[in-house]
């Protein structure tokens, strides 16, 4: 599947949370809570928290984890885009990430912003990046250790590459899909109420969409449908059914989008 995420029309470039079922099932993409607990003291493993809710990290995080504030560290608030290559490299080095580091990201809310953060790593060509399957929800439910001390790691030496634009979709791409001038399929991963225009944004969010509704031709698969009750991704067969129900089978390019980008 050729999957891209939307940038344009007021949306930030977003994380590739919708992937092929084969990719989600691969052990080189996800790590378990058991694996991470065994590797908490591994000097070649760096843990990064990217949560939606402010203050979650400070109240308690996976031991050794470094906090990335999605609205400050991973984006440029002026350009309304992902962090620049230079700023992202500085962030990673400051966080102790080197060329031989295995980086594991996790967060709250079904790993919404953690998965988006992993996508930013992917855009800049950083290798050995994993997502903790189940995120904070599963880690806490299993009563695994939490720490409230901030981590100050030794600086790393990673070098990030120029942004891979093939992983991104831009406004002309979306317009072409909406006007049926391409075979690209559009997937809106927001809630059904957002998709149907009943609300402008999720409850409690201050930053609203300019207009309610969805891009013409887009199908709706809310992000939460991709995960099980414990926060882990559903099985490959389950995901095939979820996306197959709206005509997404991986045979055509897909563009995902949401409100400002991070959920998709």
Protein language model annotation of sequence segments:
Residues 43-46, 99-102, 127, 181-185, ...:
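Loop/turn elements at helix/coil->beta-strand transitions in domains of secreted/extracellular proteins
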Residues 26, 73-79, 104-108, 119, ...:
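Second-shell loop/turn segments in exported
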Residues 46-83, 89:
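N-terminal, post-signal-peptide region of Sec/Tat-exported proteins
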Residues 1-10:
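Bacterial N-terminal signal peptides that target proteins for export
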Residues 12, 19, 23-55, 136-211:
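Flexible, polar/low-complexity N-terminal or interdomain linker segments that lie immediately upstream
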Residues 52-55, 71-75, 109-112, 136-138, ...:
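Solvent-exposed loop/turn segments at secondary-structure junctions
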Residues 75-102, 219-254:
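Helix-loop module immediately N-terminal to the HCX5R catalytic loop
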Residues 83-181, 198-199, 213, 259, ...:
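Thiolate-centered catalytic microenvironments shared by cysteine-dependent enzyme domains
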